């Protein structure tokens, strides 16, 4: 990994790493109370690069995704998001995810290891 990577930066800040879905991610910095204060009273950087992410493009993206999930995506404005379950044709849950609406795309954000279930 290059010295300017996020991993290197977080290491310099005292991050203790662990494995998530085959990736090394910061799990803590050794002081839970200080971490909580930083998150609630200041600003914090949280590395979510290990999560699955999929961009949905095309003119029918909103209609298509709206028919695949349990929440109302069509009502979202650009910059808004919602939590939803992705279901199959028999309404069986395939994954839980967040859907974010941007001007020209929808972003699906889901737990690691679920890409196959989401793209099925």
Role assignments for model-derived ranges:
Residues 1-120:
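Basic, glycine/lysine-rich polyanion-binding surfaces/domains
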């Amino acid at each position: 990994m290059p010295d300017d990577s996020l991993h290197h930066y977080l290491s310099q800040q005292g991050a203790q790493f662990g494995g998530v879905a085959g990736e090394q991610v910061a799990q803590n910095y050794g002081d839970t109370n200080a971490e909580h204060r930083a998150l609630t009273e200041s600003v914090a950087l949280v590395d979510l690069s290990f999560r699955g992410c999929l961009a949905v493009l095309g003119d029918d993206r909103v209609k298509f995704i709206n028919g695949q999930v349990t929440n109302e995506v069509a009502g979202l404005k650009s910059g808004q998001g919602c939590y939803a379950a992705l279901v199959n044709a028999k309404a069986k849950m395939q994954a839980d995810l967040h859907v974010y609406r941007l001007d020209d795309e929808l972003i699906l954000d889901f737990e690691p290891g679920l890409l196959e279930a989401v793209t099925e």
